[in-house]
Amino acid sequence: MSKNPSQEEDEAMPISEVVIKRFKRLRLVFEPSLGVLGFFLVGLCLVFSFFYLDYRTVAKTKSHDFSDQSERFLWLKELDGFEVNNTKVGFLEESGNGCDLFNGKWVWDESYPLYQSKDCTFIDEGFRCTEFGRPDLFYTKWRWQPNHCDLPRFDAKLMLEKLRNKRLVFVGDSIGRNQWESLLCMLASAISNKNLVYEVNNRPITKHMGFFVFRFHDYNCTVEYYRAPFLVLQSRPPEGSPEKVKTTLKLETMEWTADKWRDADILVFNTGHWWNYEKTIRGGCYFQEGEKVRMRMKIEHAYRRAMKTVMKWIQEEVDANKTQVFFRTFAPVHFRGGDWRTGGTCHMETLPDFGASLVPAETWDHIKLLQDVLSSSLYYSNISETVKLKVLNITAMAAQRNDGHPSLYYLGLAGPAPFHRQDCSHWCLPGVPDSWNELLYALFLKHEGYSSPRSNNSDTDNFT
């Protein structure tokens, strides 16, 4: 067999040179394959990392699907703030007198929620999150647990009995309506014939109506809501006002429906969400004292002035021997990456934030202003002797519930909403406002002199 020139050339070379020459040839043959292999391995690593990151994202932001309750329970035990078998004194027991209801944490409770939205006809479609597409139910399973005492389990029949022949009135903005609808559902859960709970003027619940009065027929009691987002009167400006003044807030005059609240047995105020630039000056709403429009008055000063008017009205117009007065503090919003107008979102939030408070600085400013007004009113006007005003200080507890908002699911059958127009201000029902009403229930029972040998899970006249 004849040899080719390459073989003859190899035989004429020393063995070491032959090895080197053949190695070089081998390298040339495999170089493209090694490049392809390297590219393949790098690509595989990238794909794996994407799957890993996506898994972490899903684990943090999506609803968790557990095979059974025990698996879910074990997972929840790992969460910060989750506590099991924490035996505490009952709030309504004698030894629970010094307990602060608002110093506590959110704990998982499989017995919640207290009602289902599909069973309650009183809920605005904007709060029916689960019925209109929200995929998770975790937000309905959290109960507020004070650190040093247990709240009484909400008993709708007991509260209705205590409300017999009485009026319970909510006055405030749409977050107040949120809480009012929550209490209607909580109480109606004890009524088998829902036709015996009705609006006395046959008005359907809508955010455009000024007030609603719902009667529980068998108990001759009413649970009412009056829309008054500023609590003081918003009206036409005085003659001769600048053209840009469309309306004014009369800081020395209560809302026109105030006469309807005066004789309530329980009166629950709230305000705050409308005391901002968007809801006032941007829309041509300025502040008025007497007949003078204060064009340069800051919103914070106007808010303080209005709250003093509210405190003065409570002192002078409310019968302290009959009426319990509560003031619920500001419930924070949880927009991320913007606000209502600029594309803020909250739809990825499915668990409470057990860490640091998310309360923004402007919210604390509202709280500080209210605290200052209450403190000065108590000090200078002897209001403590005439009105037993209690503060439902829900700001810190609500700040942790970034998971509780309607987000995309507030448009009913027309939803979900556009991604850039989410609702991270109001609350899904059932949900966070139920806990505010459980606090109201506990303080109401305390006032009524009710005591129980054992509670489910504190009374404070001011901020702690």
Curated annotation (Swiss-Prot):
Principal location class: membrane
Residue ranges annotated as motif DCXHWCLPGXXDXWN motif: 423-437
Source organism superkingdom: Eukaryota
Annotated TM spans: 33-53
CC per GO annotation: membrane
Gene Ontology terms for molecular function: O-acetyltransferase activity
One Pfam family recorded for the sequence: PC-Esterase
Compartments (UniProt record): Membrane
InterPro entries recorded: TBL, TBL_C, TBL_N
UniProt motif GDS motif: location: 172-174
Membrane topology per record: Single-pass type II membrane protein
Keywords: Membrane, Signal-anchor, Transmembrane, Transmembrane helix
Other comments on record: Contains 2 motifs that are conserved in esterases, but it is unlikely that this protein belongs to the catalytically active pectin esterases.
Function: May act as a bridging protein that binds pectin and other cell wall polysaccharides. Probably involved in maintaining esterification of pectins. May be involved in the specific O-acetylation of cell wall polymers.
Annotated family: Belongs to the PC-esterase family. TBL subfamily.
Protein name, UniProt field: Protein trichome birefringence-like 11
Organism: Arabidopsis thaliana
Lineage: Eukaryota, Viridiplantae, Streptophyta, Embryophyta, Tracheophyta
UniProt gene name: TBL11
